Amino acid sequence: MEGEPASREEGEAVNASGAAAASAFRESAQQMSNERGFENVELGVIGKKKKVPRRVIHFVSGETMEEYSTDEDEVDSLEKKDVLPPVDPTKLTWGPYLWFHMLRAATSTLSVCDFLGEKIASVLGISTPKYQYAIDEYYRMKKEEEEEEEENRMSEEAERQYQQNKLQADSVVQSDQPETLASSSFVNLNFEMEGDCEVITESKQNPVSVPL
């Protein structure tokens, strides 16, 4: 009798372990299938995001350049599509049909009035700002200040250049001055030597008569 309960417990344990293994295998298979499905979805999204060039530019050299639309252009086009949905007036009933044409006439009238009003205002000078004189005066004063600063800067640069040239000229004169002094002393020495020679020759030509 004691062997039967033990064998029964062992059988239950084996069944429980088998059920656990089966559930684990089922979970792993489900996880693998989910991962494969996720991979497939990602690949599908990547394939859809492939951009088509908006236009292709051909150069004379034979090269081509593809121009793609930016994300902002795509967003603007989507907004325009959302704001202005296509409407076929032939498929509308009488009420929406009349409302559609009334809205179209009103928008066209407003756009024409806006255009004409802008042109008339520009002709009559109404579109100019109220304080345009003050604005013009401010810009004129600012321009004069800029011109004055430019003149001052140019005069300072010219004065600086003049000072540099003057210093260079003074240095050149100082470097040349010892040479001129040496040459003048050399000339004076020559003159003195020539004078002494003339005195000696005259004394030789006119000997002094000694009384006997």
UniProtKB/Swiss-Prot annotation:
Coiled-coil residue spans: 135-172
UniProt keyword terms in alphabetical order: Acetylation, Coiled coil, Phosphoprotein
Pfam families referenced in this protein's UniProt entry, alphabetically: FAM177 (PF14774)
Keyword Cytoplasm in record: no
Compositionally biased tracts (Polar residues): 161-179
Modification Phosphothreonine occurs at: T70
Modified residues (N-acetylmethionine): M1
Modified residues (Phosphoserine): S69
Chain residue ranges for the region called Disordered: 1-33, 146-179
Biased composition (Basic and acidic residues): 1-11
Biased composition annotated in UniProt, kind: Low complexity: 13-29
Similarity section: Belongs to the FAM177 family.
Name of the protein described by the UniProt record: Protein FAM177A1
Organism: Bos taurus
